[in-house]
Amino acid sequence: MKNIKKMVLVSAFAGTCLTPHAQTASPVIPTDPAIETHIREWLQKMTLEQKIGQMCEITIDVVSDLETSRKKGFCLSEAMLDTVIGKYKVGSLLNVPLGVAQKKEKWAEAIKQIQEKSMKEIGIPCIYGVDQIHGTTYTLDGTMFPQGINMGATFNRELTRRGAKISAYETKAGCIPWTFAPVVDLGRDPRWARMWENYGEDCYVNAEMGVSAVKGFQGEDPNRIGEYNVAACMKHYMGYGVPVSGKDRTPSSISRSDMREKHFAPFLAAVRQGALSVMVNSGVDNGLPFHANRELLTEWLKEDLNWDGLIVTDWADINNLCTRDHIAATKKEAVKIVINAGIDMSMVPYEVSFCDYLKELVEEGEVSMERIDDAVARVLRLKYRLGLFDHPYWDIKKYDKFGSKEFAAVALQAAEESEVLLKNDGNILPIAKGKKILLTGPNANSMRCLNGGWSYSWQGHVADEYAQAYHTIYEALCEKYGKENIIYEPGVTYASYKNDNWWEENKPETEKPVAAAAQADIIITCIGENSYCETPGNLTDLTLSENQRNLVKALAATGKPIVLVLNQGRPRIINDIVPLAKAVVNIMLPSNYGGDALANLLAGDANFSGKMPFTYPRLINALATYDYKPCENMGQMGGNYNYDSVMDIQWPFGFGLSYTNYKYSNLKVNKPTFNADDELIFTVDVTNTGKVAGKESVLLFSKDLVASSTPDNIRLRNFEKVSLEPGETKTVTLKLKGSDLAFVGYDGKWRLEKGDFKIKCGDQWMDIVCDQTKVWNTPNKNTLHK
């Protein structure tokens, strides 16, 4: 029975991949006739081996001379280039050599060598990809930006676009044309080890920031990526951020409506913006690995949207169908499943056996030449759009702004706008100059902690070595307040980076900062997490470490006021120490300029404007998102079944304080009664009633009062960030289409139903009414991204 079951599963994948799916949309990226002509010419003359090679991606270490590289610095192996490119015609390489960032000159030298080999052996350029996910993370001396979760906290689309544009420029300075970014997974489970890579828990924020990043990376024309731009790769398609266990790469159980309405939304928006590639979720949903899901890969993405971009696997995920997920008996069978499901390129990353397996499958009739040609066309199209056939590499002398002060200023602004003030009792902040400050905690003097993963290395563990030109929190406070006014006693420290256990802490020395407190006017305690990335970041307890919490409790006993600084990639449970602090600042992972940004904010030289991009839980069994269902937050029910359900959170989504105050008034709309085709134009007056200038993120929410499927508590629909001088009032305009208030019903169809809605902006509420029900018969609403 087991074998019969497997045969049915595989034949379903193989058979349906050849079934035509009706196109319901014009090409989401305009077709370039010249590029398509070139592709047809190549497909006619390429051998099967050459075609399959284009579908294969190998990590750089395979073609490196590792022994020499470890002694003298990174260099390639001509013998392995002969095998990988000469024999197997491999069309893509990825990753960072020796596991650490390289100088742009070293990148350019290596990629020139690779491209010369590829053009000589195949006549087709190689495409090289790296994970530059928060700035130029793998190019030394480049500009690092805050991690995605911080950029979400800025609620600043333009800042996200500028950051991606700078990252593209500096990535291209090393002749790298492809970045595996942005990350638009929804960070809806605080336990998840990759929560910090995306823009937060909300699908609209991820969609807006993802679109902004694509604009910055790729420029305006997806068919002609300029010399200062790169191809974006949206990841991880999709639903990666909600594993049932909370652990990375473990199964999810996502409803069809949530998949379409929320998890698909950022990818839909980015593809409509012209995103050229997508990387697939490594996990399993409702029993089926995403890499094997033809419906999601081919139908939803390629056919329904008429998208001609490239789908690439994540690391070793074809083999995982055999070795981990057990839906394939052999690795060869796994190749068959994923290629027929719609994968175009395999991030193998070590074995060229993928090429051998796929050739055999084609010769056996298990994978059609039609599917091969479609995949290869997508690879070639990406290379033509990048201009690689004309310029396989670039003159790095053109990139004279690399690592410039101009770029650094943008990164500093991003860090300042991303750090969130959560508590400020008695206006203890800002801290006046001349105060004696006791600085404590394991995160107070660490570039590794400020940066997080994907920073100079996968786990970010070498950041203290590679980021010495930048300021830790301690160094930044010394610069701001004078070293003579900073007393540094960490009390708790992390184990050496040579220890594989990122969470491990040394024996605490709490007595030292407690003794030093007598000399201080105020205590700043920097707590949180050490750096980690992906599965190594899995944990079993979301509560902050006992050592760190005990440090705060001991310091509180001194009677000196405490400012807690939370430097972490996910919200660790701290409910027992929050009441002990006068102020709390959540800086998350602000990267190389995060220490300077914090010093500016604590001193009042900059004003807080960040807002929470996720819901911060108070208890481990009270994990929730802001768009929860009504039954998750109920008062006590009387009778025999006497129970209640409470949303017990520490800080809500969208929350953030400032050194000034904002008053909202005059919320209005042009059409209080509307239908799906109407444009709704909301206006609201926002006044800075305080004494200092500030920036305010104006968030517009909707609440569907009654629907045929249980509606969410509330949903974010638009946002704008405005700058206001003291006493200044601005009228903020926020536009929606009536169809933006639609939802996906139990039947999987988009629907907007007659009935009442409430709109919220700041403390302002208003009522609007939909007077006409509409049900879409297309998979996606036919409304382009705003």
UniProtKB/Swiss-Prot annotation:
A Pfam match: Fn3-like
General function of this protein: Catalyzes the hydrolysis of terminal, non-reducing beta-D-glucosyl residues with release of beta-D-glucose in xyloglucan degradation, leading to remove the backbone 'G' units.
Pathway: Glucan metabolism; xyloglucan degradation
pH dependence: Optimum pH is 6.0-7.0.
Entry keyword annotation includes Cell membrane: no
Enzyme class: hydrolase
Locations listed in the record: Periplasm
SUPFAM superfamilies: (Trans)glycosidases, Beta-D-glucan exohydrolase, C-terminal domain
MF term (GO), any: beta-glucosidase activity
Keywords assigned: Carbohydrate metabolism, Glycosidase, Hydrolase, Periplasm, Polysaccharide degradation, Signal
Active site location: D314
Subcellular location, principal: periplasm
Protein name: Beta-glucosidase BoGH3B
Catalytic activity: Hydrolysis of terminal, non-reducing beta-D-glucosyl residues with release of beta-D-glucose
Tagged with keyword Phosphoprotein: no
Coiled coil: none
Other information: Gut bacteria supply the human body with energy from dietary polysaccharides through glycosidases that are absent in the human genome. Xyloglucans are a ubiquitous family of highly branched plant cell wall polysaccharides present in the vegetables we consume. Enzymes involved in xyloglucan degradation mediate the conversion of otherwise indigestible plant polysaccharides to short-chain fatty acids.
Protein family per UniProt: Belongs to the glycosyl hydrolase 3 family.
EC number(s) from the headed UniProt entry: 3.2.1.21
Domain of life: Bacteria
PANTHER family: LYSOSOMAL BETA GLUCOSIDASE, PERIPLASMIC BETA-GLUCOSIDASE-RELATED
Signal peptide: 1-22
Any one Gene Ontology BP term: xyloglucan catabolic process
Any Gene Ontology CC annotation: periplasmic space
